[in-house]
Regions:
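RNA pseudouridine synthases
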Residues: 1-298
């Protein structure tokens, strides 16, 4: 609940919106809105709308066992609620409560316009174990993107500091200096998989850290913004080849993470329709070897 009110900007420190990375100091004035404690819910007969939502979730499943779900989240569906967001994965998971009233829990997030692998814990035990794997960087995530131009060199490591920059209408992550207020270190490995002349490149990305908009900000910083990115890709200065949709071309392609009960979860998501259309139009081969597999672990 506390994380939710911080995310919504309802927690204030000295009159300003607090960030989850802020550290409190003695003498600061903290305002917390009245806590609305949820009463435990129990599983019951689903309504017609609930049954439809359950069918939608079932159609998204890439992997499932007693502890874990991996969903293929479609582009355009938010993971969690926020200002003006009424439909999101966290809310949809209400229909999957078990006989004890336990609802599956999110253990990480994807941006609304990013599609692909979203890991969900079905039990408290799994949630604790999976959250620990992310915290200790035992999880390996691979993303595919279509970017403007061709990065040089074709394989490399991007290491910067990122900080949130807010305006009245929006917020973005900007490149920051070490020591800047709110700045966090972000590291990404990238590899060019295939190119379409010199205009576009299919790039595989492996984030070491998990900062907000990290991959999107890093590719924009390298002058190879992800095609269709509404925050970091300036379409006015770049002409899309015919047939390509101006939508975010970013897929959470694969996740590899230790299973809470031993072994490994390894799930992959297919290209979403708008990216598959672009791959076909550009003659890119989706089954080509992905060189990011050889990127080092940190």
């Amino acid at each position: 609940h506390i994380q939710r009110i911080v995310r919504k900007g309802e927690l204030r420190v000295n009159g300003k919106r607090a960030d989850s990375k802020d550290r409190l100091q003695a003498g600061q004035n903290i305002r917390i809105p009245p806590l609305r404690l949820d009463t435990p819910k129990v599983a019951g007969k689903l309504s017609e709308a609930g049954a439809k939502t359950l069918a939608e979730l079932k159609a998204m499943i890439l992997y499932e066992d007693d502890d874990v779900l991996v969903l293929n989240k479609p582009a355009g569906l938010a993971v969690q609620g926020g200002s003006g967001t009424t439909r999101h994965v966290d809310q949809m998971l209400e229909v999957m409560r078990d006989a004890k009233g336990q609802k599956p829990r999110l253990v990480h997030r994807l941006d609304k316009e990013t599609s692909g692998c979203l890991l969900v814990a079905k039990t408290r035990f799994a949630a604790s174990a999976l959250t620990g794997s992310f915290r200790h960087r035992s999880a390996r995530k691979i993303y595919w993107a279509l970017v403007a131009g061709v990065p040089k060199p074709k394989q490399g490591r991007i290491s910067t500091y990122l900080a949130k920059e807010e305006s009245e209408d929006d917020s973005i992550m900007r490149i920051a200096a070490h020591g800047d207020e709110g700045a966090s270190h972000a590291v990404t490995y990238y590899a060019v998989v295939e190119t379409s002349a010199t205009k576009l490149a299919w790039v595989s990305l492996k984030p070491v850290t998990g900062r907000t908009h990290q991959l999107r900000a890093h590719m924009a910083h390298s002058d190879h913004a992800i095609v269709g990115d509404p925050k970091y890709f300036n379409k006015e200065n770049w002409e899309l080849p015919g047939g390509l949709q101006n939508r975010l071309h970013l897929l959470a392609r694969r996740i590899v993470i230790p299973h809470p009960r031993g072994g490994v979860i390894d799930a992959s998501a297919p290209l979403p329709p708008h990216m598959l259309q672009s791959w076909n139009l550009l003659g890119l081969e989706a089954d080509r070897f992905d060189p990011i597999e050889n990127a080092p672990e940190e």
